[in-house]
Structures are given as structure tokens and as C-alpha cells.
Amino acid sequence: MAIKIFVILFIMLKIVSTSYAIEDKIEAELIANCAATQGGVATATPDGKIYYCAQRMANIEWKYPGAVDYFILHEYGHIVLQSGNEMQVDCWTAYEFSLMNTKKSNKSLKAAIKFIKAFKLPDPKYGGTGEERALLIEKCMEHGSDYYKNN
């Protein structure tokens, strides 16, 4: 599973020509560790480590094929931007996906949005409910990675 995720991340980063990630050649190490994610899909550290929960990712991938690509790139965004601001990183991730504009990237983004919309309880760090977070992601795709600042 780790090799598959690394390959997906590598391919995604190769596709994006105007990305911060490509320009700065920022590397990340993917590490399977469910305890480090504290129940989440994945989490990143500023020093370039992305911890992920393979069981959680497999469950999401089974129900929402392609969605995990969004979450891995999202964690990579924390490293690239050196930011813990979830809305900023969501916006960056959405915009990176919009730059890719491939069949696979569009499928992944749609799957992630569908997964995110299922969350009904508000989480302020992500901008509210799953519906509100999904709307932010959609707007960031359309308007760019700084969209979150004014909304």
C-alpha cells in the first residue's frame, strides 16, 4: 500500500507543472502509522513526514475510489506551505488538482468531495460542515489557492 501511495503522489506531482511542490522540489516521506494519525486518514509534520493509516485509507478507497489521493496531497500541502491552516491547505490542494485537470485527478477530487460532504457536524478548522468544506474546495478550484482568505 505504501508503494502505491508513493507512486500516486509521485505521478501527481509530476503532472502539476506550475505547482509550488515542483518548483521547490519538496520531498515527503510516507510512513504507515495509524497511531500517529489519531484516527484520521493522514497527518504531516513540518520536517516532511506524512503518516497515514492504511486501514482507514483502504476503507475510504473502497467506498470512494480515488479520494485518498486528495488526502495525501492535502498532507503534502501542509509540508509545502509549512502551514497548519486546514482551510489554506484545502484551497491549495483543490487548486493543484484543478491544474492537473486529468480524468484521474477529476475523479479523485469528486470522490474526496463526496466523502467530505458526508460529515454533518461542523469542524471550525475545516470551515464548518462537510458541505461547507466541500463548497470551499470547489470555489478554490475555480478561483485559486488564496480564495479561502476572503471567504
Model regions and ranges:
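Classical Sec-dependent N-terminal signal peptides that target proteins to the secretory pathway
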Residues: 1-21
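Functionally constrained cores in energy, signaling, and assembly domains
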Residues: 7, 14, 69, 76, ...
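C-terminal capping/extension segments of zinc metalloprotease domains
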Residues: 22-63, 82, 96-151
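Alpha-helical scaffolds flanking conserved acidic
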Residues: 65-70, 88, 110-113
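Active-site recognition of the HExxH zinc-binding catalytic motif
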Residues: 70-82, 90
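Alpha-helical segment that forms one wall of the substrate-binding/catalytic cleft
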Residues: 87-98
